[in-house]
Amino acid sequence: MIGHSTQEKIEKLVQSCGCNLYDLLLLKENERSILRLYITKEVGVSLDDCAMVSDLISPLLDVEDPLAGEYFLEVSSPGIERPLKRPAHYQHALGELARIKFADKNEIEGEIEAADETSVKLKGEEPIPYSLIKKAQTFYRW
């Protein structure tokens, strides 16, 4: 687990590149430990942005060493179909389509019309408290 102090330092470095830290995940895939950073930018994230963030963060991670042992650092955009985990994610996705799943396995889809610190509202629906949401993500109707 990455400590709060290290995460704040990562966030400041990402912001110094003109980007925002969207999410930070520690995971294992095929026996490999991965530290995955998702970054966003108003005009879209380029490969150069990802490389710049990676180059800035690598020395910090060498000193802070958030994971015991070897790991891979990945920096990318969260993509067009991205998870919605925090109120800020919903607020930045206003006007986009979202799929929301509840603990009882029901789900709802719709355009995000409003979002605040406690709930999200899809067009034509009542506000949904975040506490009722098990999983949510934006989606694109192809």
UniProtKB/Swiss-Prot annotation:
InterPro entries (UniProt xref): Ribosome_maturation_RimP, RimP_C, RimP_C_sf, RimP_N, RimP_N_sf
Matching HAMAP family: RimP
Q: Which organism is it from?
A: Wolinella succinogenes (strain ATCC 29543 / DSM 1740 / CCUG 13145 / JCM 31913 / LMG 7466 / NCTC 11488 / FDC 602W)
Question: Which keywords does this chain's UniProt record carry?
Answer: Cytoplasm, Ribosome biogenesis
What role does it play?
Required for maturation of 30S ribosomal subunits.
Query: Which protein, by its recorded name, is this?
Result: Ribosome maturation factor RimP
Disulfide pairings: none
Q: Which family does it belong to?
A: Belongs to the RimP family.
